[in-house]
């Protein structure tokens, strides 16, 4: 039997998340008295590095060093709603929830500080 050789190309669509009921994830960000921040999640790190990715997302969005971010994934009773850690959704869904929460937290903190200092928040 003759061996045939050639070249080919393949394309695949790999969905991220399940899109069940919108596939939501939420994140809560708490400022501490030491100036650090705690990110509360109901997703868990299953060895894929989710806690590190989430901390990096928050640090970048808040404009803080990574050392000032603590990620808490231990308590689904106090953590926000999340569909779960499955289907390659951790970084995409949870990471984006953290970025949105961190941006909102930064905006609120800047507004409060600007009002207290009687300056424009953009300054």
Residue spans of the language-model regions?
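Flexible, active-site-adjacent loop/turn segments at secondary-structure boundaries
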Residues: 7, 44, 83-84, 89
């Amino acid at each position: 039997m003759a061996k045939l050789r050639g070249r080919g190309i393949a394309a695949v669509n790999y969905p991220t998340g399940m899109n069940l009921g919108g596939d939501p994830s939420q994140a809560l960000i708490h400022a501490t008295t030491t100036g650090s921040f705690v990110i509360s999640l109901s997703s868990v790190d299953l060895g894929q590095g989710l806690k590190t990715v989430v901390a990096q997302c928050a640090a970048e969005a808040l404009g803080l060093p990574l050392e000032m971010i603590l990620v808490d994934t231990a308590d689904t009773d106090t953590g926000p709603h999340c569909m779960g850690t499955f289907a390659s959704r951790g970084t995409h869904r949870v990471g984006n929830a953290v970025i949105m929460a961190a941006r909102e937290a930064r905006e609120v903190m800047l507004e409060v500080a600007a009002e207290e200092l009687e300056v424009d928040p953009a300054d």
